[in-house]
């Protein structure tokens, strides 16, 4: 197939998806339609778009995403976001000698910025520096996944075929006996439904950010969970906690001043206090993992010694 022909196919496919969206009301009732689709609606992006609009995501924003060549469907986002609980992440590398040295260097280099954030939000520089290391190695690893595509893909998590494949994956990962497949499938179905609703909320948040014009959400790159920037905020976290650290009127989480102030603001809003219990609870709110909390707290302590 020539390059011209390939582009023609892509353009025609996108047009068909948008045309199928045009027939949808802005906020139609979602119901629970998991039946196989045909025609234009058989395209995964078309199904994802319809599911998003039916859950209240702005139709014009979805159409804008579909017209962008970066937007795509990828089953790996359905798989990873629904089944990630089956494998336990290892955070131990986050307090090795390289990590400690890097955080100490960061604390020295950005002392004034960190203390400014601390003076407003009461979050120690060592905690901010440690958290940013655990999240993105101080901006070295922010993720290459197209954020809108992550959430569009997750919108299809509760389709039967994906529930079945994810059920088998979880059973294998956790060595679950085949006799328990029905209970695992039921659990995965409920989890998939929650993930679909979660993805819709994140798409709504992306639209709100786009309206604010503080970041261009169409080109956002981040993690497999759609978290982005040095802080690895979800779009909803951006709306609630992102802060302008340099007074330029924008909030760019790939910019260090904004990232530092946003982490401090997030933890402050999450109840950061003087007791270890309050501090651990605030970090746990940032990432719902005891091992994550331990990694941040341990790295902060080791870097300050």
What residue spans do the PLM features occupy?
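Cell-wall glycan-active module
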Residues: 1-226, 236-305
